[in-house]
Design a protein with these regions (language model features):
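Flexible, acidic/Gly-rich N-terminal and inter-domain linker regions that tether
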Residues: 1-24
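Iron-sulfur-cluster electron-transfer modules
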Residues: 5, 11-14, 31, 41-216, ...
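A broadly conserved sequence feature marking short terminus-proximal activation segments
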Residues: 17-41, 271-274
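Conserved hydrophobic helix-helix packing surfaces used for dimerization/oligomerization
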Residues: 139, 260-261, 338
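Cofactor-cradling patches in redox/metallo enzymes
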Residues: 147-237, 268-284, 290-375
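Catalytic cores of enzyme domains
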Residues: 236-241, 247, 251-273, 285
């Protein structure tokens, strides 16, 4: 369906904007990019033909963290506007080459990096985990793209399998049949491909006979919970499951992990889905681990810049990355570990530690890795 930018005014409530600037004031990339959400909303609403505005490279700097939308006092759908503009550009074939490649890779191989589908389950080769279709299970551990292919993030997948096996959880994975959840695909503007992924994944979930879905990534959690129209299956992020297992006495972290740790709230888990307490409950249950929050935490957490397709976008920003800022904040707190529960956050922070030369001061861990150490 052809997109008419003139419909954006009604579709995204642009006429409600009072030009207060709250959106721009809270934007995590405002100091690194010319992106100005207040100005974009006004220009889109009051320009006869806003299409030329959409060719600005800074439109790809948005991480879709939703800080602007959540803080807007009148209900303007700022992030939906960004997604609508990107969808318009996708239809016109006017997207950056790296974004184009990520979208094509997902269509062809089921993941934005273009890794072979046959290699999607290599990480689980010796773990004895059930493959749904070959066996039945109560829960699906939906692994996701980065936890399937990225060598660093695969450690999270392995840790969670061992944790769930230790707790006696009846779960399985989809193996080679698993495809991208589509969360970033939609936020990069490919609405048609997202709808195909949602339809195909939903059919696969239902066919597998599982009773619930457990995700590793908050981005997958968000897609299944909020964007899939007909999924009809309960969805949990793994931190919710681990808390339940601890509270039921099925999982007991018993080994000491002597360190001072802080926690970074991923945008798609915290801001957008209000899961703040579970990761902290897990960390404080680990013997020997002292915990302290950074000043910017929970709803005020600083976006790492990994969402909204930023993992595949180039340009549009300059200056110190938010990941580096976040690492400095954690170090100033005295933390030796910055923990998170999102593969994208983990990767951006690990890059930030290397770039800032801070590897002798702090390490980056996923919450699941700390739990596995304590088992």
């Amino acid at each position: 369906m052809k997109i008419d930018p003139k419909t954006f005014i009604q579709d995204y409530h642009l006429n409600l904007c009072i030009q207060c600037g709250t959106c721009t004031g809270g934007c995590p990339v405002k100091f690194r990019s010319p992106l100005n959400m207040r100005r974009l909303v006004r220009q889109t609403a009051y320009t006869d033909n806003p299409s030329p505005l959409f060719k600005r490279p800074e439109l790809w700097a948005c991480t879709t963290c939703s800080t602007c939308t959540l803080r807007c006092p009148t209900g303007v759908k700022n992030v939906d506007l960004i997604m609508g503009i990107r969808n318009f550009l996708v239809q016109k074939g006017e997207v950056p080459s790296t974004i184009r490649d990520a979208l094509e890779n997902t269509l062809l191989q089921g993941n934005p990096w273009g890794r072979f589908r046959d290699r999607r389950v290599d990480w689980a080769k010796d773990l004895g985990v059930k493959i749904l279709g070959e066996a039945k299970a109560e829960a699906l551990l939906y692994v996701g793209c980065a936890p399937s292919y990225d060598p660093r993030v695969q450690n999270i997948s392995v840790a969670l399998v061992r944790i769930f096996q230790k707790a006696g959880l009846d779960f399985g994975i989809l193996g080679k049949k698993e495809s991208c959840c589509g969360n970033e695909i939609r936020r990069m503007g490919e609405e048609t491909l997202f709808k195909k992924l949602a339809k195909d994944n939903t059919a696969l979930f239902i066919k597998s006979g599982i009773k619930r879905i457990i995700t590793i990534s908050p981005h997958c959690f968000n897609a299944f919970k909020n964007d899939y129209p007909d999924i009809g299956i309960p969805v949990q992020h793994y931190t919710q499951v681990i808390v339940d297992l601890i509270e039921m006495g099925k999982l007991r972290p018993s080994k000491e992990v002597i360190t001072l740790a802080t926690y970074h709230d991923p945008c798609f888990l915290g801001k957008q889905n209000k899961i703040f307490d579970e990761p902290r409950k897990i960390l404080t249950s680990i013997p020997g681990l002292d915990f302290a929050d950074m000043e910017r935490s929970k709803q005020r957490s600083l976006c790492c810049e990994g969402g909204g397709g930023r993992m595949w976008a180039e340009g549009g920003t300059e200056g110190m990355r938010n990941g580096e800022i976040r690492i400095k904040e954690a170090i100033s707190l005295g933390a030796k570990v910055i923990a998170t529960s999102c593969p994208f956050c983990l990767l951006t922070f690990e890059d930030a530690v290397k770039i800032s030369g801070s590897s002798d001061q702090i390490i980056v861990k996923d919450v699941s890795e700390l739990v596995a150490e304590a088992m």
